[in-house]
Amino acid sequence: MILLTLRDLRHRFVRFAVVTVLGAVVFTLLFVMTGLVEQFHREPVDTVDALGASTWVLPQGISGPFTAAAPFSTDAVAVVDADEFAPVIVGRAAVAQDGSEDVVLIGHEVDALGSPPIDEGRPVAAPGELVADDSLDVDIGDRVMIAGTELAVVGLTSDSTLLAGIPLVFTELTQAQDLVYDNRGVVSAVLASGEVRAIPQGTVATSAAGVADSALEPLDGAIASVDLVRVLLWIVAAVIIGAVVYLSALERLRDFAVLKAIGASNRSLLGSLALQAVLVALLAVALAAVLQLFLAPAFPLKVSVPTRAFWQLPLIAVGVALLAGLAGMRRVANSDPALAFSGASG
């Protein structure tokens, strides 16, 4: 039956090639959508982890520092008792340089928690300096404007974005206090590492994971929309594969009747059709795995296709292909061997 299946694929090569390409386009989009959702979930975790804190001390009543603002007095910082801690400013701003781009501004003490890993250049060492994520399209030595103040870019970091690609920029704490609040007597949060033994009244200690989760909440609607698109793409893939298997079953109905008449079992005949469906699905996924390498970099948002997608997608595709081919398999199973001796194939 394997030989019969391969011969049929060769006989109808053009059709199966077209179906494989169409399926590959659908599976390529599935790879990209999967990578997009993965990036949505990975982005806040990577960004929060890069700040070096295991605990964030925040005012009570806010969901997180990146989704709400409720500054508190710098006097409260002295109450914090932890192995290592440092105050930070978190705020939204716009960077002006050949246009304007929204950013998340982080103000931190020099060489303290909140300072990101540097990929190029050096960390912030004084007011008037800025470290930016490389997605902001600025270079070391550039001068940019934030809230009417000119800052010099001294370093670049990577993978420091939030809320679906909004870049983070980092500056010295007092500089950020002036830019965000025009008040050096307030901070947005206190970052802590290690054991936290005491926090100020009216604040709560939130884990880094909790802060990352809160930063993801504004994207819940977008993630749900992408998930819906993925479901629709799976339906399209099922229709494509199911249609070609059903047409193949109709065209080969008399052949199957002949095979039944000479003693072939339903099991072997159904296996032949199932093999066709599986081969089309696997070839389409294999082609899609290559195509997504070219599509993902051109996508407007960063796409991070997880390693697990390269084994999960083929497995799901095989399952979908078998389900989609059930109609054709049922037609074969119900075919009458007497059809082999009739003058028509219907």
Stretch-by-stretch model annotation:
Residues 135-137, 145-152, 156-233:
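Mechanotransmission and gating elements of multispan inner-membrane complexes involved in transport
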Residues 1-28, 41, 345-346:
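N-terminal Sec/SRP start-transfer signal
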Residues 18-29, 223-243, 280-284, 288, ...:
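Alpha-helical transmembrane segments of integral membrane proteins
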Residues 88-91, 96-111, 116-178:
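Hydrophobic secondary-structure segments that place a key small or acidic residue at a functional site
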Residues 36, 200-241, 248-254, 258-259, ...:
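Peri-transmembrane interface segments
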Residues 20, 27-102:
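Hydrophobic, regular-secondary-structure patches
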Residues 271, 281-322, 326-339:
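Short helix-loop junctions at transmembrane helix boundaries
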Residues 9, 258-267, 335, 344-346:
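Short helix-to-coil transition segments within interhelical loops
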